[in-house]
């Protein structure tokens, strides 16, 4: 009786489909994510450095110091490409202090790398900002070591002439300041809510 019931149930019940073998590699996503985070700074820094050096090479190859080029005629009153040699800091500040700024640039590069290595997981935008600052600092440092001065060329008429390395540094600092201030505000709000509760 029991045997016949078992045989009937076995005949009625469809055979279970075998699932394909899919080995689970624990930590694969974690490793990919960690690798992605580790290359943010060098990748962004390299992009900023290459863009800066290519733009300076084009200016150096096509314009004499003091010479200007106006790629867009109707923008001439507001912006142009002007070849300027800068022996000072960003935007032409503190001229003829090249050796001092080489030392400062080396310290800044070391500080960025140290700070980056001690950042917790995540913090993508902060890492991008550090990459921009590192690439910009290296771009201007390369100029000082190779030429003895920095090549500036972006001329907005009402502002000191600057270059793409300066732009990368300023954008990187702005991003970093925004996220640090935002995190500080969120922390203060959290502490305020805890005190109220």
What is each residue range found by the language model?
Residues 2-197:
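Alpha-helical transmembrane bundles and membrane-interface segments of multipass inner-membrane proteins
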């Amino acid at each position: 009786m029991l045997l016949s019931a078992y045989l009937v149930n076995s005949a009625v019940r469809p055979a279970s489909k075998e699932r394909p073998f899919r080995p689970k590699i624990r930590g694969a996503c974690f490793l990919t994510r960690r690798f992605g985070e580790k290359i943010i700074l060098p990748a962004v820094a390299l992009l900023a450095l290459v863009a800066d050096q290519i733009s300076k090479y084009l200016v150096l190859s096509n314009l004499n110091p003091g010479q200007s080029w106006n790629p867009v005629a109707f923008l001439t009153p507001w912006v142009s490409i002007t070849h300027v040699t800068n022996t000072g800091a960003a935007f032409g500040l503190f001229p003829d202090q090249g050796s001092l700024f080489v030392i400062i640039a080396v310290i800044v590069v070391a500080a960025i790398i140290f700070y980056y290595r001690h950042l917790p997981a995540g913090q993508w935008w902060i890492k991008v900002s550090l990459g921009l600052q590192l690439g910009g600092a290296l771009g201007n440092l390369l100029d000082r070591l190779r030429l003895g001065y920095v090549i500036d060329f972006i001329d907005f008429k009402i502002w000191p002439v600057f270059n793409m390395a300066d732009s990368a540094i300023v954008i990187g600092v702005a991003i970093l300041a925004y996220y640090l201030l935002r995190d500080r505000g969120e922390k203060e709000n959290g502490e305020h809510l805890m005190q109220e509760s």
